[in-house]
Regions:
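C-terminal helix-coil-helix/basic helical segment that borders enzyme active sites and/or dimer interfaces
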Residues: 76-90, 103-136, 149-154
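FAD-binding core of flavoproteins
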Residues: 1-73, 77, 87, 179-197
Length: 197
């Protein structure tokens, strides 16, 4: 239940990322008491919210890295345990190359995310680097989840396997805290600004 009768909405069922709840919410005739005003001064809330995006995008990149690393680890483990045609899957070059690429891409995304976080820690503007890290890490998470499912074969598509959840969880990462398309716009704008100085 919502704290006021003028707040309406309900829970939205989602296909992945079930560790947090999603809600549809509408404010009908609801007025925010001045004590609850975001930004402590009228007209400042949006600016204050926007200032959180650098940190939020770095955090989302870090979450995406966790998803990607989990996919990598599961693919490696399964490929070492699963035997086909008398040998472990890891001994098939197409599988080992796929897994090697997954780990390499995850490491690249991790380094970019750490770089963005280091810039943020110094207090410098890092919207471009934060956007780059989120864009790359989210794409990497999705690619790693997809590749891990491919390594698992048909069993990976079964809903009771961890890799199916990872695939569903990875998809939202390129959407929240600014879609991949928004990240690309932010990056392009900053590149254009820095190139025209």
């Amino acid at each position: 239940p919502f704290p006021d009768q003028n707040i309406k909405g309900g829970e939205i069922e989602v296909i992945g990322y079930r560790g947090m709840k999603e809600y549809d919410i509408a404010f009908e005739g609801y007025e925010v008491p001045s004590a609850h005003l975001l930004g402590q001064k009228e007209g400042q809330g949006f600016r204050q919210l926007m200032s959180t995006f650098e940190s939020a995008r770095i955090q989302t990149a870090a979450r995406a890295l966790g998803v990607s690393q989990n996919a990598c680890d599961l693919a490696l483990k399964y490929s070492q345990e699963r035997v086909q045609f008398g040998k472990e899957l890891i001994n098939f070059s197409r599988i080992s190359e796929k897994i090697a690429a997954m780990f390499a891409e995850t490491m690249i995304a991790r380094q970019l995310t750490l770089y963005a976080a280091r810039i943020k820690d110094t207090g410098q503007r890092c919207d471009m680097e934060a956007g780059m890290s989120k864009l790359l890490a989210a794409r990497t998470a999705w690619a790693s989840a997809d590749s891990a499912l491919q390594v698992h074969g048909g069993i990976g598509f079964a809903s009771e396997t961890p890799i199916s959840r990872i695939l569903a969880d990875s998809r939202i990462l390129s959407i929240f805290e600014g879609t991949a398309e928004i990240q690309a716009q932010v990056i392009a704008k900053r590149l254009f600004e820095s190139n025209n100085r």
